[in-house]
Amino acid sequence: MYKDCIESTGDYFLLCDAEGPWGIILESLAILGIVVTILLLLAFLFLMRKIQDCSQWNVLPTQLLFLLSVLGLFGLAFAFIIELNQQTAPVRYFLFGVLFALCFSCLLAHASNLVKLVRGCVSFSWTTILCIAIGCSLLQIIIATEYVTLIMTRGMMFVNMTPCQLNVDFVVLLVYVLFLMALTFFVSKATFCGPCENWKQHGRLIFITVLFSIIIWVVWISMLLRGNPQFQRQPQWDDPVVCIALVTNAWVFLLLYIVPELCILYRSCRQECPLQGNACPVTAYQHSFQVENQELSRARDSDGAEEDVALTSYGTPIQPQTVDPTQECFIPQAKLSPQQDAGGV
């Protein structure tokens, strides 16, 4: 059965390999991930029409781009299950870094927006957040394009390179992705500082997601460059190690970031108004305080009596010992005529 599988499928034999079932297991997880990601995309598109809070809505286009990138990661898993050849090698070396760069750039853009929101500032527009995500990933696209073009045109094909060369080049191509990952990690930590508590839950989701991603990347890079050669499992374990890390990280993106974000959006849509706390109470207080200060300034330009009333209403309360008991029955704004004064006596 195993020999028939190899002879009939060639480079695709891992898709039906029952003796080494890692290909079948990862294939099943990737297909399930594709289905779940499509359902989450439809859920986000449905909820986009019901979100009333602009601060929440502005990040949704970037999250849709993030979901499309995760969908691409699950599809890319098949390029690692299939044997390395002239067709799968360029796809691996180009899309792996580009798709992960898009994912971490989207997380970075969201975290950067949260840094403003937790401090009571106004959110970036949705175009600004989306441009940050796309702009941060452009460098990885340029790097991957140049590398694949050079390999394909200079005569040294991927299949002619040694496993050690392939692995080193693969990791070196991902240096910028590692930088994006580290930057997103530190920016997400900055979202923990600020008076608006409700926005911090989004920052915690990004922080935990990136933390698990860092652990996954440290493990698979260590195995690819050091572990497999030491265990004398190179190149047999090279593709399984990278593919397992790819599928695992894609599921981490869904379970630790997208699903909780979708739950938050759903709770927000069930309320009649945006989530309490999204409009930071500190900001509202500061705004009202500024309005009161402006009214005080206008009062100082008017007559002295009006100024005294304004200061009594908005300023520091008058201490009891400073009040003259003989003045308690008089209203400062009104001036009584002599006739009214005599009648009152």
UniProtKB/Swiss-Prot annotation:
For side Cytoplasmic, which residue ranges?
49-63, 115-123, 189-204, 261-345
Q: In which tissues is it expressed?
A: Widely expressed in the peripheral system. Expression pattern is high in pancreas, medium in kidney, small intestine, spleen and testis, low in lung, colon, leukocyte, prostate and thymus and not detectable in brain, heart, liver, placenta, skeletal muscle and ovary.
Q: Name one Pfam family in it.
A: 7tm_3
The record's GO CC annotations read: extracellular exosome; intracellular membrane-bounded organelle; plasma membrane; receptor complex
**Similarity comment text for this entry:** Belongs to the G-protein coupled receptor 3 family.
Q: Which residues are the signal sequence here?
A: none
Membrane topology designation: Multi-pass membrane protein
Q: What does this protein do?
A: G-protein coupled receptor involved in hard keratin expression and likely plays a role in the development of hair and nails.
Q: Where in the cell is it found?
A: Cell membrane
The alphabetized UniProt keywords are:
Cell membrane, G-protein coupled receptor, Membrane, Receptor, Transducer, Transmembrane, Transmembrane helix
* Molecular function in Gene Ontology: G protein-coupled receptor activity; protein kinase activator activity
> Where is it chiefly localized?
membrane
Q: Which residues lie on this side of the membrane: Extracellular?
A: 1-27, 85-93, 145-167, 226-239
User: Which organism is this protein's natural source?
Assistant: Homo sapiens (Human)
What is the annotated quaternary arrangement, including any partners? Homodimer.
Q: Which PANTHER family match?
A: G PROTEIN COUPLED RECEPTOR, CLASS C, GROUP 5 (PTHR14511), G-PROTEIN COUPLED RECEPTOR FAMILY C GROUP 5 MEMBER D (PTHR14511:SF16)
Question: Keyword Repeat on this protein?
Answer: no
Q: Mind telling me which InterPro entries this protein's record contains?
A: GPCR_3_C, RA-inducible_GPCR3
Give TM regions. 28-48, 64-84, 94-114, 124-144, 168-188, 205-225, 240-260
> This protein is called what?
G-protein coupled receptor family C group 5 member D
Which domain of life does this protein belong to? Eukaryota
